[in-house]
């Protein structure tokens, strides 16, 4: 063992006979699952910034020969840029960017001997005692936008790098790409003619050396390696680069000297360096897009994904012709304009982040699904009033909207930029009986037990997240629905706040539901119809509306609760909703004082299930290079509703080439959820409207 002057260990195994146990022939290899790292930002939305990677981690390099069959690979990337003459006035010897290229290329050529990098580290460590490693304690890493906490593994993989340099390799074993924990991979000075698309699986790589091979192109999947800081391609036969390299927004050094690179690409890196070339590839990335009316000249870099499958869970209910017995609900966090910045989403082209571009994609998606109810989060006031309310009115939608609490007291122009929750419903199908706003912070301080509870004022009251509640009645069947549209706080440092917000939401819904159970029957249920123009055929008469349903108690009313809860399955907020109670001593409360909620616990009377729980939840609802998890839900009261169909997951093959959203096909970092429900047998009784004494 050799000691180092800093924490952590750097040990490289060069693949010699003395280290055969580290070879690739490992019969039962299990890689550890490492959760993505997020830098916390002082904003309610996810900031996908990457902090500088800590260098004090372990590196053991294991190399052994990889004798295997040639992997299946069909290059398909698009050649970009036309050949033009590079500015002859550039003095390569004086340009700092190209000077660095020449220096790094020279160093690369000196590293052609077998296992050069492993041997170099071994020589540096010779005679130095390495302190035994200690298991790392579990550290929680927050998602900067959505507040989901991902726990690091309690122990780390013992090695994070492989050196296969100078081995004369002509092909790579597919087993190599199962080592998803790798951070450094040296494949330099071999005889590789192609890099398998499976390279995209090694998403933790920050250093990849492919110098001195016979590569003529790179696969599109290279764009999945968004943690790359160094990519060395010296001395190959590469003429062009895939546009997907534009996703490599953290790349600091791209080595291309010794390649017949086309003049356009070479000019960018010579004049302005790696960052400029990556930005060029990102911003010039074509897209295949045909449903947007924005006048763009677009071509295909890869086809859009197949439509998400419509998963039918109950064929009898889903195929029923009685549409009034069913209700479809869509929930979507649209990523508000103020949060969609290059600093948060550096992998996305500027025009993809443009609100004018994204809002049209969102509108088209909403129209294509044509759901009965739409719940949108992160819609600012300006977008609701000036775009979505007007546009969706053409599709028979009426809307209810509230901004977050910070909009109060702002100037009108400033308030337009504050996001909130918007709920739309089909006006021809539903009657709006009531609407309510739940401001979690303001509701908390009005509680009788809030006096003397400092945490309510210091932690909860300062957060202005909200829920919008609408009470609807189906014009034809008389069935009533409570529809909730909520957006919870994201920051994992305030997990107690997120839990208390959930508890307050359920407490307020309990009160509202009891009020709605006593709501009088609706007397005028006829939908507005335009006058028939001359010569226009008669429209078929509507069925006679059924009388309003009455419910014995609030928990009997069908309840649909949608939103971005910023909570993964198994979290405290999730468990409270799903199980109806949570102990007062739950660790997420951290012994803080929140009145009776932290003294006697939290409960609610509803029997709620996650709609997507019927299929074990989706793989994710939020997708970025550093974070992939379930944050969004459609909850339903299982005693009064039955889920009959769901919108499925995003195509897995498509995701092999797309490191994160938003992009040309997905306008938000969240995806839309869509579920179809059927109303179960009536628990209440039918009540005829009382019109008073009638004359004969």
UniProtKB/Swiss-Prot annotation:
Residues 30-56, 95-126 are annotated as: Disordered. Mg(2+) binds at residue 378. Residues 34-50 have a biased composition (Basic residues). Keywords: Activator, Cytoplasm, Exonuclease, Hydrolase, Leucine-rich repeat, Magnesium, Metal-binding, Nuclease, Nucleus, Repeat, Repressor, RNA-binding, Transcription, Transcription regulation. One of its GO terms (biological process) is DNA replication checkpoint signaling. It is an enzyme of class 3 (hydrolase). It comes from the Eukaryota. Residues 96-113 have a biased composition (Polar residues). This is CCR4-Not complex 3'-5'-exoribonuclease subunit Ccr4.
